[in-house]
Amino acid sequence: MIYDKIQYIVALISEFARHYNLNDVQVARYMSRYGALDLCDSEYEVMHTQSFNDMVKAVAEYCKHNGGLL
């Protein structure tokens, strides 16, 4: 289960990076700074059943709500 969660978060970071034309390190730092990595960890069971496109949008909104500027 932990391996699946890690794979999912890595894939989500990659999709987020592609969507916003950033690199994976920038996105990982951004998501960490605004609490999205913790969100992905705690809400994995729901998030992994949704499309990456929807989750990129949801994570972006979550980060924005917490002070992110993307």
Residue ranges with predicted function:
Residues I2-D4, C40, T49:
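Serine/threonine-rich low-complexity intrinsically disordered regions
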Residues M1-Q26:
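N-terminal acidic leader/helix
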Residues F16, Y20, M31, V59, ...:
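Generic structural signal for hydrophobic core residues of well-folded globular domains
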Residues Q7, V25, Y34, Q50-N53, ...:
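Generic alpha-helical secondary structure signal
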